[in-house]
From Swiss-Prot:
Signal peptide: none annotated. It is found in: Cytoplasm. The gene is tiaS. It comes from Thermofilum pendens (strain DSM 2475 / Hrk 5). ATP-dependent agmatine transferase that catalyzes the formation of 2-agmatinylcytidine (agm2C) at the wobble position (C34) of tRNA(Ile2), converting the codon specificity from AUG to AUA. This is tRNA(Ile2) 2-agmatinylcytidine synthetase TiaS. It catalyses: cytidine(34) in tRNA(Ile2) + agmatine + ATP + H2O = 2-agmatinylcytidine(34) in tRNA(Ile2) + AMP + 2 phosphate + 2 H(+).
Length: 445
């Protein structure tokens, strides 16, 4: 008998008080492996639109892709249900769901994934998609309510399969009973790893703000997460580093993190909606305004309307670049749209397509001594303050001065990255295939 492909997507198992959907995935992987299940790919950590209001922390869902004998499918289902019962929070803001697909993932799930990356989609839409696939091949495997909020992420995580643009993340865990903000790992150890492997390991440390990016500070069970384009590097790190710290296991994910997958959709300003992750193009309408806190506000207009763009102080270098924009600059801006006395796009990157000319209007030079002349009075022309020469017919001259800001793409400082942000140091690099690591069995513990 041949192997059956089984895909399980799950979401919304954590709460502000702790736990983590990726830790539930580790429990499922351990139990599935113990009963003899195989895996078609690494587990997926799928980040969705970071701007939606209904999220706990990073708006991430998880999908696990099995290859199993048909008779093992019920036992895989039991492993999923048991892990969700044991390791998902009982909290008012937690509403988990798990979807199981036997065979190929429906193409309609792909549409859910792409929409969930860039906009706020209601669970009613996802339920209508599921209605089309009632039967043995697609089923709601787990929920605690009739309309679980985790349904959107669960379906979207399955729709991401197979990922075409991806990176990897090794997540190392402590016991879920530990809920302190501090972690038992030294900054020096993470700095050593960053210096040894960058840029193939990335988004670990922000040298400009001297801030560790790989370590969370909440009550969840994650000690740290290392991101890379090479899964073998991460497995080697796991073997080396985990001898030096106390931990409760690790899991290697394939993920859409670090791909900027949420900023691939261009919209005219008139079609921008709250919570969109979107790219807009237009002209700077007026000189940037610096408001309280050092944040920069820029009005960008296209042929359909105008939109306020916010470059927050926390974006670091992006905030500093925004101050150098001028009226008439043609720009492209990507980011998340929020509703604050109208719509505001919180910028994540800026591309200066065509800078406006920096034209200076100057008094003429004295033809005798070369000094800059001054006005001799209304209708009286100009006079030279140095030699006294007068020129009644002289006129202002115009010069194009160089701009401080050159055409190009400008990014946030690393400490302001979203999970999905693609760091500039990995632009143009491709991920290493994970088949060797998958077969080695070293991708979880």
């Amino acid at each position: 008998m041949g192997l059956t492909s089984v895909h399980v997507g799950l979401d919304d198992t954590d709460s502000p008080l702790g736990l983590c959907t990726t830790f539930v995935a580790l429990a499922i992987v351990r139990e599935a492996s113990r009963i003899g299940a195989g895996f078609a790919d690494l587990p997926y950590l799928v980040r969705l639109n970071p701007n939606v209001p209904l999220k706990t922390r990073g708006n991430g869902a998880v999908a696990i892709h099995f290859l199993v004998e048909e008779e093992l499918v019920p036992r895989v289902e039991e492993a999923v249900v048991r892990a969700l019962d044991d390791l998902s929070e009982r909290h008012g803001k937690t509403d988990p769901a798990a979807i199981l697909v036997k065979g190929d993932v429906p193409r309609a799930f792909r549409s859910v994934y792409l929409r969930a990356l860039t906009e706020f989609i209601p669970s009613s839409y996802v339920r209508s998609v599921l209605e089309r696939f009632k039967g043995e091949s697609v089923k709601l495997l787990y929920s605690r309510s009739k309309r679980p909020r985790g349904l959107v992420g669960a379906v979207a995580s399955l729709g991401a399969y197979p990922l075409e643009d991806y990176t990897y993340e090794l997540i190392v865990y402590r016991s879920p009973e530990e809920r302190s903000e501090s972690r038992d790992i030294s900054e020096d150890l993470l700095l050593e790893l960053d210096r040894k492997y960058r840029p193939l390991v990335f988004a670990t440390y922000d040298y400009s703000s001297r801030r560790v990016l790989a370590v969370p500070h909440g009550p969840d069970p994650v000690i740290f997460g290392l991101r890379s384009l090479d899964p073998e590097i991460l497995v080697n790190v796991a073997v080396d580093v985990l001898e030096k710290i106390s931990h409760a296991g690790y899991l290697l994910f394939k993920t859409n993190q670090g791909t900027s997958a949420h900023l691939q959709r261009y919209k005219p300003v008139a079609l921008v909606r709250p919570y969109d992750s979107v790219v807009v193009r237009g002209s700077v309408a007026e000189k940037p305004t610096v408001i309280s806190g050092g944040h920069v506000i820029v009005n960008v207009c296209d042929e359909t309307g105008c939109l306020q763009i916010a470059f927050y102080k926390e974006t670091g270098r992006l905030n500093r670049v925004a101050k150098l924009l001028s009226r008439g600059d043609l720009v492209e801006v990507g980011g998340g749209v929020m509703k604050k006395d109208g719509l505001v796009l919180n910028a994540e990157y800026l591309r200066l397509i065509k800078p406006a000319l920096n034209v200076k209007r100057l008094n003429p030079l004295c033809p005798k001594c070369g000094s800059r002349m001054t006005s001799a009075g209304k209708g009286k022309g100009y006079k030279c303050p140095k030699c006294g020469y007068r020129a009644k017919e002289a006129a202002k001259i115009y010069r194009v001065a160089p701009r401080t800001l050159e055409p190009g793409t400008y990014f946030q400082s690393p400490s302001a990255y979203r999970h999905l942000t693609k760091p500039p140091e990995i632009l143009g690099l491709r991920p290493v295939d994970a088949t060797k690591v998958l077969l080695s069995g070293m991708w979880f513990m």
